[in-house]
């Protein structure tokens, strides 16, 4: 018997919740707690791959999610088409945490990358370049780069000290 891929359905969104939606999921994410997040503007479905249980929670942000970056077991940064939010997942709910330097940054988020050693969040935007939020100083800055009118599509580590930043047509940059 030759090797072949085999797919088994392990979770299906509730039909009554998605029947009138042309795109029932705007974003999906797998966290370090074995949860697969299936997100839309109204609801977050967290399917745990170990317990096989699903938690449905209200999307307290009320916006389409574009990216999620996990900080620790319970804290996340969540990017949307309108901005970025700091949240905590606890007591079977998503709780927004105040963060004035990010809450007042009304930009479309394309990509998030959290650099754990420095505790800095790199924020890739749509046509506004890249921002850096330092969790130690609680400050948000924009690096002195010529990326201020560029869309950032991906941020990935090159090594322990450098990141690669991919853009939508303007090349790949190293920070």
Where do the protein language model's features map onto the residues?
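Carboxylate-rich, polar loop motifs that coordinate divalent cations or form catalytic acidic clusters
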Residues: 1-175
């Amino acid at each position: 018997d030759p090797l072949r891929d085999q797919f088994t359905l392990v979770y299906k969104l509730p039909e009554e919740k998605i029947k009138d939606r042309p795109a029932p999921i705007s974003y999906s994410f797998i966290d370090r707690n074995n949860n697969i997040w299936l997100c839309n503007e109204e609801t977050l479905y967290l399917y745990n791959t170990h317990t096989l249980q699903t938690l449905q929670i209200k999307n307290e942000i009320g916006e389409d999610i574009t990216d999620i970056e996990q900080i620790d077991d319970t804290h996340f940064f969540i990017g949307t088409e309108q901005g970025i939010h700091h949240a905590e997942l606890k007591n079977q709910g998503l709780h927004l945490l105040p963060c004035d330097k990010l809450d007042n940054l009304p930009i479309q988020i394309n990509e998030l990358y959290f650099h754990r050693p420095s505790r800095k969040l790199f924020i890739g935007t749509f046509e506004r370049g890249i921002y850096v939020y330092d969790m130690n100083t609680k400050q948000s800055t924009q690096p002195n780069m010529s990326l201020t009118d560029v869309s950032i599509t991906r941020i990935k580590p090159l090594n322990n000290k450098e990141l690669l930043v991919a853009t939508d047509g303007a090349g790949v940059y190293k920070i």
